[in-house]
Amino acid sequence: ACAFAIGSSYAGKCAVTITSGPGKALKTELIGLAVMAEIPLVLVDVQRGGPSTGLPTKVEQGDLLSVIFGEPGDTPKVVMAPATIEDCFYSIITARKIAETFRTVVVVLTDANLATGQQPFTRPKFNPAWLAPPIDQSPIPEGAKPYDWHPKTGLSRRFIPGQPGGMHTITGLAHTNNAKVAYEPGVNQEGCDFRSLKLAAFQKTLKTPTVYGDPEGDLLVMGWGSTRGAIEEAVDRARADGLRVSSLHLKFLQPMASGLKEIMQKFKKVITVEINYSDDPRHEMITEDNRRYANLAWLLRARYLVDADCWSNVHGQPIKPGAIEQMMRERVAALKETEIDTLIER
């Protein structure tokens, strides 16, 4: 299915392939091909419980790290996660536009909650802008190359088979800007540099996400995907009782929008709520040297060097607002106790 989608896109018609975590693993080599050849590809990963056959009909958010880092070599791609069923409808349109504009792979992470759930929303009025543009058959300017990377953005014109002057080879091997296979020193480095620049160029188009609640406080709860509703309901309940808690939900997970570090720095503690595995820090064998964090928490700690904690499970069930609210209360209470202890020590 992934190969068919790549072939369709190469011919000028962007296509999507839909799978779950194990299916995505089987598509690893083809995803790498789409990245290397810079062929637009949209892949939807409907996450479910793992590992192996795991919980094939239950919910999980365990594929984030494997989607970002799972291919051999450097394979920059856009990763996004809709939060509602309505969001899924619009996200796939957005994903296609991103894939075609930046000649890249876009992975849309959904999960079993979104795949099997129901949500009423107003039927959208058809917008012609949602459709892919007609296949470009205009002549290629003389001297243009299939990978004529722009020095600032890494972007290059997309050649479509049949365009006069556009004949070229397509390959998954390291190649020059003229699509010629090459092993000279620096060729692969140059290609990797420009493909990474495309991700940076796309990141410049993203808006900083909005904090749900006050922009500063004691606790910031961060999440992604289908957990948004439960998190925001829990925040509403806690804030109604005077707790200084807020939440921030991320739609784009690779790359992340600018301004996130500044948001996190305005809170005393940052914690992620996720449906994937993390170690229980209370266990006697778990230390800071060996603790495994939930997927998003791991990314935040690595990228922003913040002391982000996590609260997650792999029960195969949606996380309930009441459980999140209870966790918030416990974390805020722990913060207050720490502040009191610090004052006493002084």
Language-model features, listed with the residues they occupy:
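Thiamine diphosphate
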Residues: 1-69, 78-99, 240
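Hydrophobic alpha-helical context, especially transmembrane and signal-peptide helices
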Residues: 3, 12, 75, 86, ...
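Homeobox/homeodomain signature
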Residues: 16, 31, 54-57, 75, ...
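Short, conserved catalytic or adaptor-binding loops enriched in Gly and charged residues
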Residues: 66-73, 301-304
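Short glycine-enriched loop/turn motifs at secondary-structure junctions
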Residues: 73-74, 215
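Flexible, low-complexity linker and terminal segments
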Residues: 91, 96-346
